[in-house]
Amino acid sequence: MLIVGSPVSPYVRKILAILHLKGLEYELDPITPFYGNDEFSKLSPLRRIPVLIDGDLVVNDSTVIAEYLDEAYPDVPVLPKGARERAQSRWIEEYADSRLGDLCIWGLFFPKIVAPHVFKRPPDEDALAKVTDGDLPEALDWIEGRAPAEDFLFGDRIGVADLAVACPLRNAAIAGWTPDPARWPRTAAWLARIATLPCYTRTMAFEPAILATRADGRRAALEAAGVKVAETSFGTDTPRASIMLR
């Protein structure tokens, strides 16, 4: 099984945590979509990550991948059992992927971390302030109303909805923003519980190999962190904007 995508992406991080939780072996091609080659465009027509390749099957979109993994490898489920709970889980995941992902990635992580290095574009401080002072707190108010007082959203085992919330907020933390425990105590405690789980902490151990390592040393750094890096890559040396940035 091959996962195409950088482990710093919240959507890739979500899938890697699920693979770790399920005990599934995988190889990783740790590209960002901005450095995907023409073959990557064929795999992912929206030039988004992650992409899962399982034999001759290609699956795009982290939500679709998570559901495929739960159906194909059901021993350790990440979706709840009942129809009502599954619907709730899917909605929370959608909110996290869409709203939190938009704010944490495109509102914070991309302008502060990615754009200055890849596209030599300085951040717009007014736009950042709108996210950190208005939009993101509003989203966290909604999350706080649904955060579990103990354990996880659907019982004593972590699921995909928990990971969907935690993963983009991890990128916000890398960009310098974390939820204030005084304002969002349930959310902060819930995120802290998630951060202690081996399936999740293992993904965090991959971050320095991407964020603090030169491109020519990342393969060795990832392998030192326990990643089986794919022999061939869908990456290229020249960045290009994704469809979402055009």
Describe each region flagged by the PLM.
Residues 1-130, 233-246:
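GST-like domain detector, emphasizing the conserved glutathione-binding G-site
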Residues 31-34, 185, 207-208:
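Residue-level "edge-of-site" marker
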Residues 73, 147-150, 198, 207:
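A general structural signal marking secondary-structure boundaries and capping sites
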Residues 96-196:
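GST-like fold's C-terminal all-alpha helical module
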Residues 132, 136, 196-213:
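Charged/polar, low-hydrophobicity segments characteristic of intrinsically disordered regions
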Residues 207-246:
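Acidic/histidine-enriched, glycine/proline-rich intrinsically disordered or flexible terminal extensions
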